[in-house]
Amino acid sequence: MLDFFSKKGNEDSEEIVLIEDKMPKHIAIIMDGNGRWAKKRGLPRTMGHRAGVKTIKTIVKECDKLGVKYLTLYAFSTENWKRPEDEVNALMKLVVEFIKNEIDELHQNGVRVQTIGDLSRFPEEPKKAILWAMEKTKDNTGVVLSLALNYGGRNEIVRGIKSVIEDVKAGKISIDDINEDMFNDYLYTKGMPDPDLIIRPSGEQRLSNFLLWQCAYSEFWYSQINWPDFNGEDLRKAIFDYQNRDRRFGGIK
């Protein structure tokens, strides 16, 4: 067992005991609340995003310490292009800054960086930085940090279906070969386990087009805390709640 004396945000402290054998293999987080965090402090939204980037480092370290193998972060959705141009440009710059400032430490700690989503629309500078980080860390065996960039769950499924159809037409597979396991190989998350736990801070309770195929049996945990204020204690509380649920996967116990 892993024993922590912790507290949730500003609430009363409480003891959290985590069980190593019940640790989620894959945690996915919808990093929400940057704008609210900034507005509350009278700051521009871009400052909220910058504060949120610092939280990423904290949570990656915590996952490594706890033995969580896969961490997927919803960083930029296919719908985020609709935001004001200056905000989108600021987000692209933050991607580059994050990689330049953090990649050496991530690499030294064995973190493998990868992405899910379509990078083709990304500007050249952030795209090069991302690909460089992936190449630099490709042989690492620690936490697998997947950044969801220009990602949308519906888009991913449609893309996968199109690829399946193309392979059927080309004679590479037959219709009888198609099943859930095979279709998984046509998704961005190929080779990864489905998320055991999906966390969304900020008080919102929706999926926002995130991992729609993969979340069929995921457990969800919502928090009123905005992402820039989310910390290791909050992560442990989410895991504690997850470990005390009865996961039946559609069956009966």
Swiss-Prot record:
GO terms for cellular component: cytosol. Its cofactor is Mg(2+). GO terms for biological process: polyprenol biosynthetic process. Its EC number is 2.5.1.-. It is an enzyme of class 2 (transferase). The active site is at 32, 80 (proton acceptor). GO terms for molecular function: ditrans,polycis-undecaprenyl-diphosphate synthase [(2E,6E)-farnesyl-diphosphate specific] activity; magnesium ion binding; manganese ion binding. Belongs to the UPP synthase family. The gene is uppS. Catalyzes the condensation of isopentenyl diphosphate (IPP) with allylic pyrophosphates generating different type of terpenoids. Signal peptide: none annotated. Binds 2 magnesium ions per subunit. This is Isoprenyl transferase. Keywords: Magnesium, Metal-binding, Transferase. Homodimer. It holds the Pfam family Prenyltransf. It comes from Clostridium perfringens (strain 13 / Type A). Mg(2+) binds at residues 32, 219. PROSITE patterns: UPP_SYNTHASE (PS01066). Substrate binds at residues 33-37, 45, 49, 77-79, 81, 83, 200, 206-208.
